[in-house]
């Protein structure tokens, strides 16, 4: 879960939610 926050431009998923999640999913897929 820590990687999610770091890969989201330093934003917290709890605050943005879907908006940040959309941009984070791409970073997570590339990381794996």
UniProtKB/Swiss-Prot annotation:
Its main location: secreted. Disulfide bonds join 8-24. GO terms for molecular function: hormone activity; toxin activity. PROSITE patterns: NATRIURETIC_PEPTIDE. The keyword Transmembrane does not apply. GO terms for biological process: blood vessel diameter maintenance; regulation of blood pressure; vasodilation. It is found in: Secreted. Keywords: Disulfide bond, Hypotensive agent, Secreted, Toxin, Vasoactive, Vasodilator. Expressed by the venom gland. One of its GO terms (cellular component) is extracellular region. Snake venom natriuretic peptide that exhibits hypotensive and vasodepressor activity in rats. Belongs to the natriuretic peptide family. Snake NP subfamily. Negative results: vasodilation does not appear to be mediated by the natriuretic peptide receptor-A (NPR1). This is Natriuretic peptide Coa_NP1.
